Structures are given as C-alpha cells and as structure tokens.
C-alpha cells in the first residue's frame, strides 16, 4: 500500500521495497499523477513520487525564482533524504526536463534515466516563449485556480483515446497545485535548454514519446535521444502527452525492461 510522507521540505508518496525508483511529475501534475507506475513497479522496487517544490504538500524553493539548477539540487537532496546514494530516475514532461539536469549536474545520483513526453529544449518548433507563457498564465491572471481549468488543459494535451478514469486521476493531481506554484513553473519551463549539456549524460537512458503528442512531439524525442550517448527511443502508438496514464501498461513494461537491463549489466 502506498504511503504519503511529509518531509521537512519535500512531500512524497512511496510504495514497495528494493532499489529506489523516483518519479518526477510534469508541470500540471503532482505525486498522485503516477498511480499506475507506483502500483506496477512497487512489486520489485521501492518507488517514490514527489510533489515538486511548491506543489501539493512540498515547501517552495527558498529564495529567488524557480530554476532548473535549483530543482535538480532539490531532487538530489530528496534522493539523499530517502537514504539512497543513487536512484533510477523517471520523469515526464517538466519532470523529465529536471531529470536531464539532474543527470548532468548530479550524475552520482542517477543509476538510470527514463524520459517520458519531453524535450531537450523549449520551443524546438519555433514556439514563442512569450506567447506560450501568456496563454498559460491567462487563466491564473483571471483568478482561476488550476482545479477550475484542469479538465480543459488535460483534454487538450491528451491523445484521443484516454479513458475517463485516467483523466480523472490527472484532474485530481492538477487540483493539488496552487496558482502561485504553477506560475513559477511556467516561468521556469520557458528557460529550458539542455542541448549543450546532453552529451555529458552517462546514465543508460530510455526516451519514450506518444505518437500523437502535440506538446512534445516525436521529433523532439528524436533530437533528445540522439544527443544522449546511451539512449534508446520508443514511440508509443496512439498516445498523447499524458503518456504514463494513456498507455500505462506499455510504459510500465518498458520501464521494467529498462531497469532490468541496467541492473543485469
């Protein structure tokens, strides 16, 4: 059974025993975004899913704006709080962006890397950071909390075949985010550009993308996997951006294979 833990700075959900797997959610998620992975992977591993700093029950980063450097440090500190020297790191969307920096700047913490529905840099298709930021900040500026617009946002980024139960779980995850925390994350995401750093990643890496992902499309995943020395790319048919719940069985099986391969080396 999963246990919720409120640490001094970071709160997380944990299940299982064994080697540590940590799960880093995306911009509109929280620790409950990972229910299918907690259930599936905890039969063989100790699995922990955090609330991003400032999200859910986690304290915000102290001082200054949210940056990827600070988030990577927070992730490294959290792994230490869990009593581990290293972990299999799984991230989705913004969480997979954080994972890239974690693997570069804190390589001793990362036994393996799984990057879902993400990008090596913001705006590879020419998207204007200012326009993207303005569109996502608009409902917050109008006084709407994330819970009020979660359904609209999630349906827009999901593939056409997501079931209502999976969508409901993601709505509940997004409802746990404060407007202030979401605003800080939006400002952070537009600064993402790990491309000059990716060749330094030495951890075995699995990159997965949904065939129908319009937020971080397959072309982004090809650039990402091509820039990491020990990376494998898997495209999931008929899935959108909410990959871990839209194609949970496929994702869980791929992660399990990846971790087994790493541990058998």
Model regions and ranges:
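Acidic catalytic loop of the alpha/beta-hydrolase fold
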Residues: 211-216
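Flexible "cap/lid" loop of the alpha/beta hydrolase fold
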Residues: 100-105, 111-142
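Catalytic active-site module of serine/aspartate enzymes centered on a nucleophile-bearing elbow/loop
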Residues: 231-265
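Conserved HGGG/HGGXW glycine-rich cap/lid loop of the alpha/beta-hydrolase fold
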Residues: 8-61
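Conserved alpha/beta-hydrolase catalytic His-Asp/Glu region
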Residues: 124-130, 143-199
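Conserved acidic catalytic loop of the alpha/beta-hydrolase fold
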Residues: 70-87
């Amino acid at each position: 059974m999963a246990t919720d833990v409120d640490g001094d700075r970071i709160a997380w959900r944990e299940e299982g025993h064994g080697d540590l797997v940590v799960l880093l959610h995306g911009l509109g998620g929280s620790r409950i975004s990972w229910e299918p992975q907690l259930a599936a992977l905890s039969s063989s591993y100790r699995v922990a899913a955090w609330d991003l700093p400032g999200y859910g029950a986690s304290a915000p980063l102290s001082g200054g704006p949210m940056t990827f450097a600070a988030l990577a440090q927070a992730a490294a500190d959290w792994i230490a709080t869990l009593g581990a020297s290293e972990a299999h790191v799984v991230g989705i969307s913004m969480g997979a962006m954080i994972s890239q920096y974690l693997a570069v700047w804190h390589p001793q913490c990362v036994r393996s890397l799984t990057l879902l529905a993400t990008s090596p840099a913001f705006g590879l298709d020419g998207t204007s950071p200012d326009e993207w930021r303005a569109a996502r900040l608009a409902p917050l500026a109008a006084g709407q909390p994330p819970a009020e617009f979660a359904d609209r946002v999630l349906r827009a980024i999901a593939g056409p075949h997501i079931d209502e139960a999976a969508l409901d779980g993601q709505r509940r995850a997004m409802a746990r985010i404060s407007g202030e925390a979401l605003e800080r994350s939006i400002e952070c995401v537009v600064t993402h550009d790990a491309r000059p750093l990716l060749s330094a990643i030495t951890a075995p890496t699995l990159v997965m993308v949904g065939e129908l992902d319009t937020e971080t499309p397959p072309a982004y995943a090809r650039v990402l996997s091509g820039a990491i020395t020990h990376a494998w790319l898997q495209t999931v048919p008929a899935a959108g951006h909410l990959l871990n719940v839209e194609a949970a069985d496929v994702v869980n099986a791929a992660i399990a294979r990846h971790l087994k391969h790493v541990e058998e080396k």
